[in-house]
Amino acid sequence: MEIISEDMLRHAIDVIGRTEGIQMDVDSLIDDLFILSNIYSTEQTFILAVNQIHHSLKQIEKTRTICTELFGNLSNWRSFHFQSRRVNKQSADLRIVYQDTGDFIQVRGFGNRHLPHDFYKRIYKR
């Protein structure tokens, strides 16, 4: 099994962390990318997933309300569903949970829907 390098993780932190109009807790960003690197464990699949997250964040920032409203303990948050790689008939395996503050998009977390465990249960604790 390939391991994602620290340099690649740092680059991913930089790319996602500097997305204009997006704010996210740094510790949560690092945690989410570390988990992502264990799921998409080859350089190619990791880069594809990070690029899709970055693209989706820009789309969310531009459009604001393009996704599902959450309920219960995550009410006032939204969930955006998308593919880790753009392939016909691939299910939307990635999620971004965010809130529009009016001034910026506050990201609570991102990751694979099911791996390594339920995404929503993981970010609920934040």
Describe the residue ranges of each PLM region.
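Phosphate-/polyanion-interacting regions in eukaryotic proteins
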Residues: 67
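Intrinsic disorder/low-structure terminal segments
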Residues: 45, 70, 79-81
